[in-house]
Amino acid sequence: MRKIYATGKRKTAIAKVWLTPGKGELSINEQSLNQWLGGHEAIKMKVMQPLLLTKQEQSVDIKAVVFGGGYSAQAEALRHGISKALNAYDIVFRAILKPKGLLTRDSRVVERKKYGKRKARRSPQFSKR
């Protein structure tokens, strides 16, 4: 029985994912998917997307530890980690996951604040007179 490890990232969220052949159990931070999400269906679909595309939702067990960021970033980090683990599990899945962009790290992060400005781009109010 192989145990595959993969890491997914999004913004400041990091997901450590362990994938094993099994019967479709999902454990996120030692909770079920529904307990962890609290009933957010859109975020649940985001997490399940790589499993549904590869039709592996009933044939692999996933144990994940997710930290940092908010719920949406954590869900996308988890999706990235699951996709990378499925790719390592069977190379055939690459042809399914790659065109959907699930193996690509989303590199968009918060822009840093610059001096002389109120935020990253917001300037102080300008008065002509």
Swiss-Prot record:
Taxonomic classification, please?
A: Bacteria, Pseudomonadati, Campylobacterota, Epsilonproteobacteria, Campylobacterales
Alphabetically, the GO molecular function entries are: RNA binding; structural constituent of ribosome
Its domain of life reads: Bacteria
| GO BP field | translation
Q: Where do the TM regions start and end?
A: none
- Alphabetically ordered keywords of this record: Ribonucleoprotein, Ribosomal protein
InterPro entries the record matches: Ribosomal_Su5_D2-typ_SF, Ribosomal_uS9, Ribosomal_uS9_bac/plastid, Ribosomal_uS9_CS, Ribsml_uS5_D2-typ_fold_subgr
> Key word Ribonucleoprotein present in the record?
yes
Keyword Protease present in the record's keywords: the answer is no
Gene responsible for this protein: rpsI
The Swiss-Prot or TrEMBL record describes its family as follows: Belongs to the universal ribosomal protein uS9 family.
Which Gene Ontology cellular-component terms appear in the entry?
cytosolic small ribosomal subunit
List the protein's name. Answer: Small ribosomal subunit protein uS9
Instruction: Name one matching Pfam family.
Output: Ribosomal_S9
